[in-house]
C-alpha cells in the first residue's frame, strides 16, 4: 500500500467536491486529513470582491495568477510539514491542468474526478446561490478534458457519505495509483485516457 498523503478531487462546480472531501475526512478518522481548495484563499478576499466574482462572474478585481501561486505554495507547505491533504479544484483549461501538474508533480496524489448530470448541477447551484449558472455550465462542459484520473464517480444520485464509504477502501487497498504519471505523459501525447476504475 502506498503512503497516500494527497488526494485531488477534480470536478465542475456543483458536483459535490467539498461534500466528498468532508465525508472522506470523517471516513479516514482517526487519521487526520486537512481539506484545502482555491476557495480557502478566495474567501480571504474582501466580501465585495468575492461577491463580484461569484455572483456576477466578474473576476477583474482578482489577481488570479497570484491566487494560484499562493494556493499551490500553501498546499506544498502543508504537505512538506507532514499533513495529509484533500485538495479540491475545478480545471477548466489546459493551462490550469499544467499548473496543477507542475506544482504538485513530486507528491504523486490520488486523482478523483466527480461528474454529475446537468439538471442536478443546475438544481444544486440555484439552491446554493453562491455561483452563477454560467460558471457552473462552463465547469460542466470542460471538466474531464485535461486530466487523467484514478477514479471517476457520478454523484447525481449518490450521497457523499456513500461515495466515501466505497472509495476509501479502494484508495488504501491499492498498491498503485498511476493517473498522475499518465497525466504527465498526456502533456506530451495530447490524449486523455480513461480512469482505471469507476467505484
Walk through the language-model features, giving the residues of each.
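P-loop (Walker A) phosphate-binding loop of NTP-binding proteins
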Residues: 12
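Small-molecule kinase domains that catalyze NTP-dependent phosphoryl transfer to phosphate-bearing small molecules
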Residues: 124-199
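Conserved phosphate-donor/acceptor-positioning beta-strand/loop module used by diverse small-molecule
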Residues: 105-124, 153
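Walker A/P-loop
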Residues: 18
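Hydrophobic anchor at the beta1->P-loop junction of P-loop NTPases
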Residues: 9
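Glycine-rich phosphate-binding loop used to anchor ATP phosphates in small-molecule kinases
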Residues: 62-108, 115
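Conserved substrate/cofactor phosphate-moiety recognition/catalytic segment
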Residues: 22-70
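ATP-binding Walker
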Residues: 15
Amino acid at each position: 500500500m502506498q503512503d497516500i498523503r494527497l488526494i485531488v478531487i477534480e470536478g465542475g462546480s456543483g458536483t459535490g467536491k467539498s461534500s466528498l472531501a468532508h465525508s472522506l475526512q470523517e471516513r479516514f478518522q482517526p487519521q487526520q486529513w486537512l481539506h484545502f481548495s482555491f476557495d480557502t484563499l478566495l474567501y480571504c478576499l474582501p466580501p465585495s470582491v468575492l461577491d463580484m466574482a461569484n455572483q456576477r462572474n466578474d473576476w477583474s478585481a482578482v489577481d488570479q495568477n497570484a491566487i494560484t501561486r499562493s494556493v499551490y505554495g500553501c498546499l506544498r507547505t502543508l504537505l512538506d510539514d507532514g499533513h495529509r491533504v484533500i485538495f479540491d479544484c475545478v480545471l477548466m483549461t489546459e493551462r490550469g491542468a499544467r499548473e496543477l501538474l507542475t506544482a504538485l508533480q513530486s507528491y504523486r496524489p490520488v486523482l478523483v474526478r466527480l461528474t454529475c448530470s446537468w439538471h442536478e448541477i443546475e438544481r444544486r447551484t440555484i439552491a446554493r446561490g453562491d455561483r452563477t449558472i454560467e460558471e457552473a455550465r462552463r465547469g460542466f462542459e470542460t471538466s474531464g478534458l485535461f486530466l487523467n484520473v484514478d477514479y471517476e464517480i457520478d454523484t447525481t444520485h449518490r450521497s457523499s457519505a456513500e461515495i466515501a464509504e466505497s472509495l476509501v477502501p479502494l484508495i488504501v487497498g491499492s498498491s498503485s495509483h498511476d493517473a498522475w504519471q499518465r497525466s504527465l505523459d498526456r502533456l506530451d501525447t495530447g490524449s486523455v485516457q480513461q480512469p482505471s476504475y469507476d467505484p
